[in-house]
Amino acid sequence: PFEEAFIRHCRWTPSAARPYVVNADPGLVDRLYDEEHTIKGVTLTAVGFYGPQGRVLRLPLAMPGINDRITAFRYEGYKVTNYEMESAAITGLCNLLGHRAATICLIIANRINGDASADYHSYMNKLIRYTLEKLS
């Protein structure tokens, strides 16, 4: 469903690592969500920092325009709201071991607009406190 729609929409290159979906625990998502302070979305976990996240260093991208296609992707009201490198592995391992897991991220940069927060540390501290309060 989501996975196949994402692969089709993004015109995923068969030679690239195949995307897969790891679901967060719905109960944790509900506990962490607050309409005023958070956004529900999809965290995309990339296999690398540069090319896999659409950053050009010295080599051309294997999938030019991938970030535009990811940005335009929608599935049953969900969209990709974050790009990082760890969540799928951690959540997948938790699921395999019978633990509950969810991801809550601080968005510190907007690649599309080229904006980034210079001082995100105070916001990270607020997010940590917010998360601990929601889970306790």
Report the location of each language-model feature.
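Glycine-rich phosphate- or other oxyanion-binding loops that anchor nucleotides, phosphorylated ligands
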Residues: 1-136
